Regions:
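Amphipathic, Lys/Arg-enriched alpha-helical "gate/interface" segment within cytosolic domains
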Residues: 1-155
Length: 155
């Protein structure tokens, strides 16, 4: 699977995107964002795109833009921050510069590792006095042992 998501660690909503993601896979991933939004509670998103090496075609890009706009319109007010793992230092730098020029509504950072992204997400939650579940802290410890670890279903 080249695109998927989980809210098993809510209020941390985790998304993974890889090269070759299909519209069907991306639709399922965006459904995870909708499900998180339907909870009606503040949350953060953590997206791992570290293995992406190529730009998707125009149809996929348009689909992602439309889905993102819809989710943001409906549930964006609940998102505290967004951390994105980006493999390329050049792309990471370019995205950071774009955010300096045109800041996003919510804080957004681009990191090199899942650990850095999760640490930032925890920090945002704590700053907003949103409870950080023990499963999120356990996942952080898991990442210390294995930087590529994926969360185990907590619920």
């Amino acid at each position: 699977m080249n695109a998927h998501g989980t809210d098993v660690l809510f209020p941390v909503v985790m998304l993974d995107v890889r090269d070759g993601a299909t519209i069907g896979e991306l639709r399922t991933m965006f459904d995870v964002l909708r499900t998180a939004g339907l909870r009606g509670k503040p949350h953060v998103t953590m997206t791992d795109s570290s293995t992406v090496r190529s730009m998707p075609d125009a149809t996929v890009r348009r689909f992602v833009a439309e889905q993102q706009a819809e989710v943001e319109t409906l549930y964006g007010h609940l998102v505290i921050g967004s951390a994105v793992v980006v493999g390329s230092s050049v792309v990471r730098g370019a995205l950071t510069a774009i955010n300096w020029i045109k800041p996003t509504r919510v804080p957004q950072v681009f990191t090199t590792t899942r650990m850095d992204a999760l640490v930032q997400c925890i920090s945002w939650l704590e700053q907003e006095a949103v409870a950080v579940p023990p499963e999120v802290r356990a996942y952080r410890m898991q990442l210390e042992r294995n930087p590529n670890a994926r969360p185990v279903a907590a619920r």
